[in-house]
């Protein structure tokens, strides 16, 4: 399959041979040989370009791309737990988005994750925002409780919200409220009298998100 020519190894290929075989000094290069060289160079450039495009597409197909369009919230629910950028050791602080209340068009809660994930879908531009799941579920429960809707529907919705947290062995305490910003857990994880101390501000119950991120790595 290979031949030796002027100390160089070249493969029997109608295109590669023309590009790799020995060329005489520049003073002996004819216009025909120059045109042949340019054609070979163009072919090689095309091969490299196609290989780069294919490689780029394959890499993008194996990771979660955080550039979102209006019809792509479903991709968030299909993604594995911990795929959101907020889950990678960052604390749950207030989202840095102006007018968040009026710009939020949807709320998603991934209850099967441990800890659960809550994502706000924000418009203009459309994108997901990972937020404190316990605070979100607590806020939704309060809205449903005070909302003007049929009682049977209200009870079913409250049960679904409570179940979204009970899947991860936790449920919010209605009196003590949601955990502080930057924390996953809250007073509802502890039994009295510790819960009373936390409610009165005598004890801190904050466990940062980085704690759960480290658990996922181990």
From Swiss-Prot:
It is found in: Virion membrane; Host cell membrane; Host Golgi apparatus, Host trans-Golgi network. GO terms for cellular component: host cell Golgi apparatus; host cell plasma membrane; membrane; viral envelope; virion membrane. Residues 57-185 are annotated as: Interaction with gH. It is a peripheral membrane protein. Disulfide bonds join 81-113, 183-206. InterPro entries: Herpes_gL_C, Herpes_gL_N, Herpes_gL_N_sf, HSV_GL_alphagamma. Keywords: Disulfide bond, Fusion of virus membrane with host cell membrane, Fusion of virus membrane with host membrane, Glycoprotein, Host cell membrane, Host Golgi apparatus, Host membrane, Membrane, Viral envelope protein, Viral penetration into host cytoplasm, Virion, Virus entry into host cell. The heterodimer glycoprotein H-glycoprotein L is required for the fusion of viral and plasma membranes leading to virus entry into the host cell. Acts as a functional inhibitor of gH and maintains gH in an inhibited form. Upon binding to host integrins, gL dissociates from gH leading to activation of the viral fusion glycoproteins gB and gH. This is Envelope glycoprotein L. The gene is gL.
């Amino acid at each position: 399959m290979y031949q030796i020519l002027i100390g160089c190894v070249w493969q029997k290929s109608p295109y590669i041979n023309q590009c790799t075989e020995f060329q005489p000094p520049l003073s002996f290069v004819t216009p025909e040989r120059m045109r042949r060289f340019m054609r070979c160079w163009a072919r090689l450039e095309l091969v490299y370009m196609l290989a780069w495009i294919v490689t780029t597409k394959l890499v993008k197909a194996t990771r979660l791309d955080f550039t979102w369009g209006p019809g792509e919230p479903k991709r968030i629910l299909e993604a594995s737990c911990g795929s959101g950028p907020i889950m990678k050791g960052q604390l749950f602080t207030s989202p840095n988005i102006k007018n968040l209340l009026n710009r939020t068009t949807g709320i998603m809660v991934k209850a099967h994750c441990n800890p659960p994930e809550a994502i706000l879908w924000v418009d203009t531009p459309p994108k997901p925002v990972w937020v404190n799941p316990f605070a979100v579920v607590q806020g939704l429960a309060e809205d449903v409780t005070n909302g003007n809707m049929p009682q049977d529907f209200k009870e079913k919705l409250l049960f679904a919200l409570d179940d979204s947290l009970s899947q991860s062995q936790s449920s919010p305490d209605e009196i003590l409220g949601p955990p502080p910003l930057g924390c996953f857990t809250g007073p509802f994880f502890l039994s009295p009298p510790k819960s009373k101390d936390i409610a009165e501000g005598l004890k801190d119950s904050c466990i940062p998100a980085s704690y759960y991120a480290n658990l996922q790595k181990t």
